[in-house]
Amino acid sequence: MAGSNLKTLAYTQIRRKIVSCEYAPGSNLNEEMLTSALGLSRTPVRDALGRLEQEGLVEIRPKKGVTVTPLTVTDINMIFELRRLYEPFILENYGHLLPAEQLNEFYQIFQTPPEDGFESERSSLAFYDLDEAFHAMIVQSCPNVYIRRSYEMIRTQNERFRHMTAATYVKRLEDSYTEHLEILRACLAQDWKDAAERMRIHIEKSRVAAVDRAFEYMKRTAE
């Protein structure tokens, strides 16, 4: 396999393990362990770690090794702070660029309760993909490439956080469905100011719930 392909393979596999929390936040990694686990040489692994450091997923310290970047309550608050700045702004200023067909599709989906009910972990995990697709649609409609690029970094961290706290998310699932419907109704009515305000409310409620879930996770893992 060509060297560039090996670098891509190493990057993809290590990144997936970090995002899925198989390599947990705060855990220590080293090149020897990674080369053995992936069946690759040091060069592609080292290259992958450099890329992951640029993404904020690992911290590389000379003579101390590699640490998977921790996810703290402060990090979570900062992620939601950025979302609160960007997503309502996009709706208010670029909402008219959103594809009406996709808005209608999402509206129909959020009107239908999950087959397994709101209290199941399976429904919660399925909601992650739906929620991610909905918010990605909004951000991708923004023509400002700098907003899209900076948002991409928090998407990765947000995905990692979701994996970390999946078991506790079911408590907020039903409310999230309702909040998404309210945002979508405003979008379909082309009331972008109202859509932006409902997005602010949704993001703030999500932030409060996320902080609670983080504390639950830390308590559970400390036991």
Per-range role (PLM):
Residues 1, 31, 72, 116-120, ...:
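A short, mixed-charge helix-start or loop-turn motif at secondary-structure junctions
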Residues 1-97, 212-223:
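Short linear motifs at protein or domain termini
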Residues 5, 173-174:
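Short helix-capping and inter-helix turn/linker motifs at the boundaries of alpha-helical repeat units
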Residues 22, 57, 121, 191-192:
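Residue-level recognition of short, well-ordered coil/turn positions
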Residues 58-59, 152-157, 171:
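Mobile beta-alpha loop/short-helix "lid" or hinge segments that flank ligand
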Residues 86, 175-178:
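Alpha-helix N-cap/N′ positions at the starts of helices
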Residues 91, 96, 100-165, 177-186, ...:
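Conserved amphipathic alpha-helical segments that form helical-bundle/coiled-coil interaction surfaces
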